[in-house]
Amino acid sequence: MRQITTDVATLSYTNGNQHSRSNTFRSQASGSSGNSRQSGKQSKSGGSGTPTSSRSKFTEQLDQGYVPSPVPAIAPAAAVDLHRRPTYQSTGSSSTLVGSALERKINDQDPYQKHDTTERLNALRELMKKDDLDYYVVPSEDAHGSEYVAVSDKRREWISGFTGSAGVAIISKTTAYLVTDSRYWLQARTQLDNNWNLVEGGSVGGPTDWIDFLVARAKDSRIGIDARMLAHEKAVLLNSQLQAKGSKLFYPPQNLIDLIWKDKPPRSKEPVYVQPLKYTGMEANKKLAKLKDWIKAQPPTVPSYSKTPPTANQMQVGTLISNLACIAWVLNLRGDDIPFNPVFHAYLFVSAEQAILFIDPAKITEGVDEYLKSINVQRREYNDVWSFMRRKEWGDGRIIITPQTSYAISLMLTSYRYTVLPSIIEEWKAVKNPIELEGLKSAYIRDGVAFVRWLAWLEYKMSQGYVITEYEAGWRLTEFRRMGKNYRGLAYENISATGANAALPHYVPHKKDEILIERDTPYLNDSGGQYLDGTCDTTRTIIFDRPTPEMIEAYTRVLQGHIAIDSAVFPEGTTGKQLDVLARKALWKDGLNYMHGTGHGFGSFLNVHEGPHGFSSDVPLVPGHVITNEPGFYKAGHWGMRIESALYVKRVTTKHEFNGNIWLGFERLTCVPIQTKMVNPDVLSKEEKQWIKDHNRRCLEVLEPYLREDKRALSYLKKEASRDIGISKPLVKDFAIDWN
């Protein structure tokens, strides 16, 4: 029995937010009797091989690119037993959180354990019986229609045990259903207990969504739902379809889940703060003035046959904003109420005469209070919005709401006092101004620096034969991000996945799972930082050993789709949906596909998912839009791959301008090399090969000035910029030497 322990000196550093920390790393190489780590359900124990030489103490300088002399001997790859590798552990990260909600190590918690929901369902059915309900519906969203919600708003997760961000629970008198889309089918099968039936929304021959499923089952039924959690447009659709089946919706005065959720956590009291003009590019009072002018310009709601002048009650006089990101954008405020999303719970009413922010007063500091006064925004209690609506305190006229506004609000207003229009703020927010765009460029450079330093570190550690788990790899990348200027936390939970886990598009590792990164299957990392000047979202897929022909075929097709989107030139008025096929065309040639969207908009230090545009949207792309480009392929139960870069839309010059059209294209924001080991150069066009070389060389050109002090990262970057496309030819069967 033999055990080697290497202690690494403590590293202290300070990031852009002045949060300093100390971290200690420990590596262990064990003999045949040492402790083993787990990969999935299978133990990684077995074999007796170890690196041929033990290593004496070395400092964290090694992790910064400095290699002490003499360099320890490294065993040839063939001599390293991958089932018994020295371990790498990143400890103490929880002591360095930046922001109370933007970077919460939710996956530090114990892995999700399937629990018995019988008691909770029985309690819910008792309340349903009192209200004579045949069904009760529990959506994922909160009262603001948020995609990602605070812990206190995770009602569907609490009742069902399913932790995915999308899905609707439908509970009948005897049965419980969970309806979710293809991204979460495998996860739901794992997490739901025997009380639940998974309904695969969008599957072949199955229901399109939860509304389709419910309408098909409900006949002469009374269906309960919290109207606050139901969007206006969905409520109108659902009501019309249910009426045809003799069924109707019922809105209990209190949320039934809240009545039985005894240990429901309280809402955040974290203070909101002002986002400076140097990042927003436009003062809040100018945004409010623009919004007021837009309200005044909206035509009155009058019948088409009317020949009389509009009355006061037919005029559009104000708007109620419930979308949290829209409120944050208009007021140039940010908050910490929802993990990874810098927003805060509030409503905002704006008319030509006034602006009122409905918010918990505990969240308003003296400085923010003075700021609100300076932009002429009144402040009232968060829940006062309901009495304000009920009493029609603004006076005569109609209020503009969006299709996504809570149905409870439109019920309170009645149809004579509201007008439904697409969100003008979503439209404005999506088009980044020059300051926001420059901020995003800077943020993506800093995020790229962190990503490259991490890739170099990970490749080095794996080449040394270290054991690294999915969790440890993901949080090591977070540690590199923390060093960046303006860092405010993660934009979403780290997706760090190996093997079969990479086939789950929204998989998140947990600390205690201890799932090892496999060398012979693709490893996928989808992550991004929140910076004061931008929100980042990047995915790269890499492999450490020789890929199989099947992996090469799929990865090459994914990359071809990625290049096709990136290189697209299109006339003004083209929608994202019209371009979506470009990302899938190469995959379709081989009968392959992916079930998620090709890309989405994202914010300027706001939410990582932002509309209204996207590659699934009918909204035309315009200069200033930013959008992700993320085709992928997933072999369920085996491996998955995705390549994601961020783009912005700009005007381009073409050889001809047919019919006087304006032509548009994309420019890449992401500056992270793309590994070419899984690429088959024989199926690439000349232009595609050149694109890959140009991209990796551009990464070197842009990032080199920031990496001169990190020799290992710079060496990695230069290697990727000069590497030939494809893998080296095997010298012997199933074995190759990569001299790089």
List PLM regions with ranges:
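Active-site neighborhoods and metal-handling regions in enzymes and metal-associated proteins
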Residues: 2-740
